[in-house]
From Swiss-Prot:
GO terms for cellular component: cytoplasm. It is an enzyme of class 2 (transferase). This is 2-dehydro-3-deoxyphosphooctonate aldolase. The lineage of its organism: Bacteria, Pseudomonadati, Pseudomonadota, Alphaproteobacteria, Hyphomicrobiales. Keywords: Cytoplasm, Lipopolysaccharide biosynthesis, Transferase. The keyword Cytoplasm applies. Belongs to the KdsA family.
Length: 278
């Protein structure tokens, strides 16, 4: 029976719960070519200086926005061309979400990691389609699932012939418009054998908390990120923007890009200590 790979290679980066931390970062949604290049360039320069592996993330379509009138992104066709150019310019892998089986084939021709959104993490046909592309698959744990429920989700991808899968913790529903991060989830997810990612920015989201959009508590991103890295993870997922308060989506939980380097430096120190002790 196929098992998940404990080490997942993406370009020159290896995601492993036992190896140094890697970073998945970028703005919530792709806004324009110029904005994508600005964000990727700034993060790439920083991560090269710090010596941490970097995967650029952004969404071409925010398909689960709270309101019908909310901005969703620039669309699949435009985004794929920009992602291709970003890879050539900055030599970094790309992660983006897929929402349908048909998107998996299209996106996998350009992108390195297919991300399964939390709300869709039990959709068998989507998971199988993502698995069959051969791309690395990052599955976000649904806010409605216990960590041990993710073992069966993981098996849907692995038993479809793709052992290169990662599990991402992004918080659990805790009453209305609230999420909580239970750090016990991380060792439980690790026990299934796949690399574990902690999404520190969506974990402070307040889903639908502003009526027509989601709120968030940006001030707690670092607290949760420190805790997760201390427990031990393969990677940290952070959404960032030069002006989060005016971003088209998820602004309240994104961190300012000007604050990113200090945060990553801190997390790398916690990661180094945690993995030495373990």
């Amino acid at each position: 029976m196929t098992k998940p790979n404990a080490r997942v290679k993406v370009g020159n980066i290896i995601f492993s719960n036992e190896m140094p931390l890697s970073l998945i970062a970028g703005p919530c949604q792709m806004e324009s070519r110029d904005h994508a290049f600005e964000m990727a360039g700034r993060i790439k320069t920083m991560t090269d200086q710090l010596g941490i592996g970097f995967v650029y993330k952004s969404s071409y379509d925010k398909a689960n926005r709270t309101s019908l009138s909310a901005a969703r992104g620039i669309g699949l066709e435009k985004a794929m061309a920009i992602f291709s150019d970003l890879k050539k310019e900055f030599d970094c892998p790309i992660l983006t979400d897929v929402h349908t089986e048909e998107q998996c084939t299209i996106v996998s021709s350009t992108v390195d990691i297919l991300q399964i959104p939390a709300f869709l993490c039990r959709q068998t046909d989507l998971l199988v389609a993502a698995a069959k592309t051969g791309c690395v698959v990052n599955i976000k744990k649904g806010q409605f699932l216990a960590p041990w429920d993710m073992e069966n989700v993981l098996k849907k991808v692995v038993h479809s012939g793709n052992p290169n899968v990662m599990l991402c913790e992004r918080g659990t529903s805790f009453g209305y418009n609230r999420l909580i991060s239970d750090m016990r989830s991380l060792p439980i997810l690790r026990s299934f054998g796949a690399p574990v990612i902690f999404d520190a920015t969506h974990s402070v989201q307040e889903p639908g908390g502003q009526g027509a959009s989601s709120g968030g508590q940006r001030q707690f991103v670092e607290v949760l990120a420190r805790a997760a890295v201390s427990v031990g993870v393969a990677g940290i997922f952070l959404e960032t923007h030069q002006d989060p308060d005016h971003a088209p989506s998820d602004g309240p939980n994104m961190i300012k890009i000007d604050d990113l380097q200090r945060l990553i430096e801190t997390l790398m120190e916690f990661d180094d200590l945690s993995k030495k002790l373990n």
